[in-house]
Amino acid sequence: MSAPDSPALAGMSIGAVLDLLRPDFPDVTISKIRFLEAEGLVTPRRASSGYRRFTAYDCARLRFILTAQRDHYLPLKVIRAQLDAQPDGELPPFGSPYVLPRLVPVAGDSAGGVGSDTASVSLTGIRLSREDLLERSEVADELLTALLKAGVITTGPGGFFDEHAVVILQCARALAEYGVEPRHLRAFRSAADRQSDLIAQIAGPLVKAGKAGARDRADDLAREVAALAITLHTSLIKSAVRDVLHR
Protein backbone atom coordinates (compact mmCIF):
# COMPACT_ATOMS: atom_id res chain seq x y z
CA MET A 1 0.00 0.00 0.00
CA SER A 2 1.43 3.37 -0.97
CA ALA A 3 2.13 5.92 1.70
CA PRO A 4 -1.17 7.70 2.46
CA ASP A 5 -1.26 11.46 2.19
CA SER A 6 -4.71 12.30 3.53
CA PRO A 7 -5.63 15.92 4.28
CA ALA A 8 -5.74 15.10 7.99
CA LEU A 9 -2.16 13.88 8.08
CA ALA A 10 -0.34 15.43 5.11
CA GLY A 11 1.91 18.37 5.78
CA MET A 12 1.97 18.19 9.58
CA SER A 13 4.31 20.42 11.52
CA ILE A 14 6.99 18.91 13.74
CA GLY A 15 4.94 19.97 16.77
CA ALA A 16 1.88 18.13 15.47
CA VAL A 17 3.98 15.03 14.87
CA LEU A 18 5.28 15.26 18.42
CA ASP A 19 1.72 15.42 19.76
CA LEU A 20 0.82 12.37 17.66
CA LEU A 21 3.73 10.29 18.91
CA ARG A 22 3.89 11.25 22.56
CA PRO A 23 0.96 9.11 23.79
CA ASP A 24 2.99 6.03 22.84
CA PHE A 25 6.47 7.53 23.23
CA PRO A 26 6.43 9.94 26.20
CA ASP A 27 10.17 10.59 25.99
CA VAL A 28 10.25 11.69 22.36
CA THR A 29 11.27 15.30 21.78
CA ILE A 30 11.58 17.70 18.87
CA SER A 31 15.36 17.37 19.09
CA LYS A 32 15.00 13.59 18.78
CA ILE A 33 12.94 13.96 15.60
CA ARG A 34 15.47 16.43 14.20
CA PHE A 35 18.27 14.03 15.07
CA LEU A 36 16.57 11.20 13.16
CA GLU A 37 16.14 13.57 10.22
CA ALA A 38 19.84 14.48 10.37
CA GLU A 39 20.64 10.76 10.26
CA GLY A 40 18.60 10.44 7.07
CA LEU A 41 16.00 8.13 8.59
CA VAL A 42 13.11 10.46 7.87
CA THR A 43 13.01 13.15 5.19
CA PRO A 44 10.16 15.63 5.66
CA ARG A 45 9.67 18.11 2.87
CA ARG A 46 10.20 21.80 3.42
CA ALA A 47 7.37 24.26 2.90
CA SER A 48 8.04 27.55 1.11
CA SER A 49 8.33 29.11 4.56
CA GLY A 50 11.18 26.72 5.36
CA TYR A 51 9.29 24.76 8.00
CA ARG A 52 9.30 20.97 8.00
CA ARG A 53 6.11 19.29 6.79
CA PHE A 54 5.64 15.62 7.67
CA THR A 55 3.41 13.18 5.80
CA ALA A 56 1.67 10.11 7.21
CA TYR A 57 4.50 8.01 5.79
CA ASP A 58 7.07 10.10 7.68
CA CYS A 59 5.09 9.53 10.87
CA ALA A 60 4.94 5.78 10.23
CA ARG A 61 8.72 5.68 9.76
CA LEU A 62 9.22 7.60 12.99
CA ARG A 63 6.92 5.21 14.81
CA PHE A 64 8.80 2.24 13.39
CA ILE A 65 12.15 3.70 14.46
CA LEU A 66 11.03 4.59 17.97
CA THR A 67 9.42 1.19 18.47
CA ALA A 68 12.50 -0.65 17.20
CA GLN A 69 14.67 1.32 19.62
CA ARG A 70 12.35 0.97 22.59
CA ASP A 71 11.19 -2.62 22.22
CA HIS A 72 14.16 -4.23 20.46
CA TYR A 73 17.07 -2.01 21.51
CA LEU A 74 18.26 -1.84 17.91
CA PRO A 75 20.96 0.62 16.82
CA LEU A 76 20.11 3.01 14.00
CA LYS A 77 22.18 1.24 11.36
CA VAL A 78 20.17 -1.94 11.91
CA ILE A 79 16.90 0.01 11.87
CA ARG A 80 17.98 1.69 8.64
CA ALA A 81 18.57 -1.73 7.09
CA GLN A 82 15.09 -2.83 8.17
CA LEU A 83 13.53 0.26 6.61
CA ASP A 84 15.55 -0.07 3.42
CA ALA A 85 14.16 -3.59 3.05
CA GLN A 86 10.67 -2.10 2.65
CA PRO A 87 9.52 -1.07 -0.85
CA ASP A 88 10.23 2.60 -1.48
CA GLY A 89 7.38 4.88 -0.47
CA GLU A 90 5.20 2.07 0.82
CA LEU A 91 3.71 1.14 4.15
CA PRO A 92 2.68 -2.34 5.31
CA PRO A 93 -0.25 -3.74 3.30
CA PHE A 94 -2.27 -4.45 6.44
CA GLY A 95 -4.11 -2.41 9.04
CA SER A 96 -3.84 1.32 9.52
CA PRO A 97 -1.01 3.52 8.22
CA TYR A 98 0.47 3.34 11.71
CA VAL A 99 0.80 -0.44 11.83
CA LEU A 100 4.51 -1.13 11.69
CA PRO A 101 6.25 -3.44 9.24
CA ARG A 102 7.61 -6.57 10.82
CA LEU A 103 11.36 -6.63 11.30
CA VAL A 104 13.05 -8.55 8.51
CA PRO A 105 16.43 -10.29 8.63
CA VAL A 106 19.39 -8.07 7.85
CA ALA A 107 21.62 -9.33 5.08
CA GLY A 108 24.54 -11.25 6.53
CA ASP A 109 22.88 -11.85 9.87
CA SER A 110 22.27 -15.38 11.08
CA ALA A 111 20.33 -16.62 14.05
CA GLY A 112 21.71 -14.92 17.08
CA GLY A 113 23.17 -12.03 15.07
CA VAL A 114 22.87 -8.35 15.78
CA GLY A 115 19.27 -7.30 15.51
CA SER A 116 17.94 -10.78 16.16
CA ASP A 117 16.10 -11.88 19.26
CA THR A 118 19.33 -12.46 21.12
CA ALA A 119 20.10 -8.76 20.89
CA SER A 120 16.61 -7.54 21.68
CA VAL A 121 15.95 -5.74 24.92
CA SER A 122 12.72 -4.01 25.86
CA LEU A 123 13.09 -0.47 27.12
CA THR A 124 9.53 0.56 27.80
CA GLY A 125 10.30 2.07 31.21
CA ILE A 126 7.59 0.08 33.03
CA ARG A 127 7.60 0.27 36.83
CA LEU A 128 6.32 -2.83 38.59
CA SER A 129 5.54 -3.38 42.24
CA ARG A 130 6.56 -6.67 43.84
CA GLU A 131 3.00 -7.94 43.53
CA ASP A 132 2.81 -6.90 39.85
CA LEU A 133 6.12 -8.59 39.12
CA LEU A 134 5.05 -11.86 40.70
CA GLU A 135 1.73 -11.78 38.87
CA ARG A 136 3.32 -11.13 35.48
CA SER A 137 6.10 -13.67 35.87
CA GLU A 138 3.93 -16.32 37.58
CA VAL A 139 6.87 -17.15 39.84
CA ALA A 140 6.82 -17.94 43.56
CA ASP A 141 7.73 -15.16 45.98
CA GLU A 142 10.43 -17.37 47.49
CA LEU A 143 12.40 -17.37 44.24
CA LEU A 144 12.17 -13.60 43.93
CA THR A 145 13.40 -13.23 47.51
CA ALA A 146 16.36 -15.50 46.79
CA LEU A 147 17.27 -13.61 43.62
CA LEU A 148 17.11 -10.29 45.45
CA LYS A 149 19.32 -11.66 48.21
CA ALA A 150 21.82 -12.92 45.64
CA GLY A 151 21.83 -9.54 43.88
CA VAL A 152 20.66 -11.05 40.60
CA ILE A 153 17.57 -8.80 40.55
CA THR A 154 17.68 -5.24 41.84
CA THR A 155 15.05 -2.58 42.35
CA GLY A 156 15.06 0.90 40.92
CA PRO A 157 13.93 4.24 42.39
CA GLY A 158 11.05 3.85 44.82
CA GLY A 159 11.64 0.13 45.16
CA PHE A 160 10.01 -0.69 41.82
CA PHE A 161 11.13 -3.31 39.31
CA ASP A 162 11.51 -2.86 35.55
CA GLU A 163 10.18 -5.14 32.83
CA HIS A 164 13.50 -6.98 32.57
CA ALA A 165 12.89 -8.42 36.03
CA VAL A 166 9.99 -10.43 34.58
CA VAL A 167 12.28 -12.14 32.08
CA ILE A 168 15.01 -12.68 34.69
CA LEU A 169 12.52 -14.33 37.03
CA GLN A 170 11.12 -16.60 34.35
CA CYS A 171 14.60 -17.64 33.21
CA ALA A 172 15.65 -18.30 36.81
CA ARG A 173 12.60 -20.50 37.31
CA ALA A 174 13.38 -22.46 34.13
CA LEU A 175 17.02 -22.87 35.14
CA ALA A 176 15.96 -24.07 38.58
CA GLU A 177 14.47 -27.13 36.89
CA TYR A 178 18.04 -28.06 35.95
CA GLY A 179 19.36 -27.54 39.45
CA VAL A 180 20.65 -24.00 38.91
CA GLU A 181 20.18 -21.96 42.08
CA PRO A 182 20.02 -18.17 42.48
CA ARG A 183 23.56 -18.11 43.92
CA HIS A 184 24.80 -19.66 40.68
CA LEU A 185 23.35 -16.72 38.75
CA ARG A 186 25.54 -14.13 40.45
CA ALA A 187 28.19 -14.66 37.78
CA PHE A 188 25.70 -13.63 35.10
CA ARG A 189 24.85 -10.47 37.01
CA SER A 190 28.50 -9.61 37.58
CA ALA A 191 29.27 -10.08 33.88
CA ALA A 192 26.31 -7.89 32.90
CA ASP A 193 27.44 -5.14 35.29
CA ARG A 194 30.98 -5.19 33.88
CA GLN A 195 29.67 -5.04 30.33
CA SER A 196 27.32 -2.15 31.11
CA ASP A 197 30.22 -0.26 32.72
CA LEU A 198 32.23 -0.73 29.54
CA ILE A 199 29.35 0.54 27.41
CA ALA A 200 29.00 3.58 29.67
CA GLN A 201 32.70 4.33 29.23
CA ILE A 202 32.29 4.22 25.45
CA ALA A 203 29.07 6.24 25.16
CA GLY A 204 29.47 8.55 28.15
CA PRO A 205 31.92 11.02 26.57
CA LEU A 206 29.38 11.84 23.85
CA VAL A 207 26.91 13.08 26.46
CA LYS A 208 29.56 15.12 28.23
CA ALA A 209 30.50 16.80 24.95
CA GLY A 210 27.24 18.76 25.21
CA LYS A 211 26.79 19.13 21.44
CA ALA A 212 23.39 19.24 19.76
CA GLY A 213 21.96 15.74 19.53
CA ALA A 214 24.75 14.38 21.73
CA ARG A 215 22.43 12.44 24.02
CA ASP A 216 20.64 10.81 21.09
CA ARG A 217 23.96 9.86 19.50
CA ALA A 218 25.20 8.45 22.80
CA ASP A 219 21.95 6.48 23.18
CA ASP A 220 22.30 4.98 19.72
CA LEU A 221 25.97 4.18 20.28
CA ALA A 222 25.07 2.42 23.52
CA ARG A 223 22.41 0.39 21.71
CA GLU A 224 24.86 -0.62 19.00
CA VAL A 225 27.61 -1.64 21.43
CA ALA A 226 25.10 -3.45 23.65
CA ALA A 227 23.75 -5.42 20.68
CA LEU A 228 27.29 -6.42 19.73
CA ALA A 229 28.10 -7.35 23.33
CA ILE A 230 24.97 -9.52 23.61
CA THR A 231 25.78 -11.29 20.35
CA LEU A 232 29.41 -11.78 21.41
CA HIS A 233 28.37 -13.14 24.81
CA THR A 234 25.90 -15.54 23.23
CA SER A 235 28.45 -16.79 20.71
CA LEU A 236 31.10 -17.26 23.41
CA ILE A 237 28.71 -19.37 25.49
CA LYS A 238 27.72 -21.50 22.48
CA SER A 239 31.37 -22.01 21.57
CA ALA A 240 32.35 -22.92 25.13
CA VAL A 241 29.46 -25.37 25.49
CA ARG A 242 30.36 -27.03 22.21
CA ASP A 243 33.97 -27.41 23.33
CA VAL A 244 32.90 -28.97 26.63
CA LEU A 245 30.53 -31.43 24.97
CA HIS A 246 33.08 -32.54 22.37
CA ARG A 247 36.12 -33.04 24.59
UniProtKB/Swiss-Prot annotation:
GO terms for molecular function: DNA binding; DNA-binding transcription factor activity. Pfam families: MerR_1. GO terms for cellular component: cytosol. Induction: Autoregulated. The keyword DNA-binding applies. This is Uncharacterized HTH-type transcriptional regulator Rv1828. Transcriptional regulator that binds to its own promoter and thus may play a role in the regulation of the cotranscribed genes Rv1827 and Rv1828. Can also bind several promoter regions of genes that are essential, including ftsZ. Binds to the imperfect everted repeat sequence CTCAA through its winged-HTH motif. SMART domains: HTH_MERR (SM00422). Contains an N-terminal DNA-binding domain, a linker region and a C-terminal effector binding domain. Dimerization is mediated via the C-terminal domain. SUPFAM superfamilies: Putative DNA-binding domain (SSF46955). Keywords: DNA-binding, Transcription, Transcription regulation. Residues 14-38 bind DNA. GO terms for biological process: regulation of DNA-templated transcription.
